From Swiss-Prot:
It comes from Rubrobacter xylanophilus (strain DSM 9941 / JCM 11954 / NBRC 16129 / PRD-1). InterPro entries: Ribosomal_bL27, Ribosomal_bL27_CS. Keywords: Ribonucleoprotein, Ribosomal protein. This is Large ribosomal subunit protein bL27. One of its GO terms (molecular function) is structural constituent of ribosome. The keyword Cell wall biogenesis/degradation does not apply. The keyword Phosphoprotein does not apply. Belongs to the bacterial ribosomal protein bL27 family. Residues 1-21 are annotated as: Disordered. GO terms for cellular component: cytosolic large ribosomal subunit. One of its GO terms (biological process) is translation.
Length: 86
């Protein structure tokens, strides 16, 4: 005879790893060329001046400068404004 009842198995208890999405460089922050500005799924934020978009919709700086967030045609847009070396 069984000493204990059979321990049932649970079908829950799993979760996916977080993807660490979001803004990585905020407005007025200085970034160097190639720096990631926003990690996202889809184009929640669109690339503006001096900003490129990667295959996974990541936005990155094409030049050294300061990050500027704004709106254009009803969309959120991020640009990088070149800054003269101090």
């Amino acid at each position: 005879m069984a000493h204990k009842k059979g321990g049932g198995s649970s079908r829950n208890g799993r979760d996916s790893e977080s993807k660490r999405l979001g803004v990585k460089a905020y407005g007025d922050q200085f970034v160097s060329a190639g720096s990631i500005i926003v990690r996202q799924r889809g184009t929640k934020v669109h690339p503006g001046l001096n900003v490129g978009r990667g295959g996974d919709d990541t936005l990155f700086a094409k030049v050294d400068g300061r990050v500027r967030f704004g709106r254009s045609r009803g969309r959120s847009v991020v640009s990088v404004v070149r800054e003269a070396p101090a």
